[in-house]
């Protein structure tokens, strides 16, 4: 069988083996390893530089957009006419912003009765950025039977199988 690891499992693997430096990957952007958490399985870490740059760009855009809106809330707390007051009112506005952009995990928020402040969690952002463009293929087949390149190709071909099943299930099926 061939499968892939989900993001939390990839983060756990990166913590176990140290950060995956770009120099560790060969010219095919593949790295084979094993883990005690997945006994008897081969793990192939793949790096997609285009996906990495896209995720980094998107994350930075979302962080910037979140900061712009959070700054507006901070200003609303300090304005002289009708200042925003009360922890519940401030928290409600802040919650709407961080929920909209899904960036709560990257900000440290401080809300009091009369003030609001925020700052980026640089360590969390750096940790997430280290995993940009990485995905891990997991297989039970030995290397003699299926090498790393073939495992990646087989995993990518699963998308075609999924597409075929999806089209089989559609209502537009005509016999």
Q: What do the predicted segments below correspond to?
A:
Residues 1-175:
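Anion-binding and metal-coordination hotspots
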């Amino acid at each position: 069988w061939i499968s892939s690891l989900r993001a939390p499992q990839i983060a756990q693997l990166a913590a176990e083996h140290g950060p995956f430096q770009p120099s560790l990957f060969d010219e095919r952007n593949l790295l084979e390893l094993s883990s005690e958490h997945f006994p008897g399985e081969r793990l192939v870490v793949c790096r997609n530089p285009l996906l990495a740059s896209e995720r980094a760009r998107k994350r930075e855009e979302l962080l910037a957009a979140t900061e712009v809106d959070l700054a507006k809330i901070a200003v609303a707390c300090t304005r002289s006419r009708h200042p925003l007051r009360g922890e519940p009112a401030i928290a409600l506005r802040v919650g709407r912003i961080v929920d909209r952009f899904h960036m709560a995990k990257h900000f440290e928020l401080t809300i009091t009765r009369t003030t609001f402040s925020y700052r980026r969690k640089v360590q969390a952002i750096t940790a997430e950025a280290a995993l940009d463009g990485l995905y891990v293929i997991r297989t039970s087949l030995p290397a003699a039977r299926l090498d790393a390149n073939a495992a990646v190709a087989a995993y990518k071909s699963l998308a075609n199988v999924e597409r075929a099943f999806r089209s089989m299930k559609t209502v537009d099926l005509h016999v």
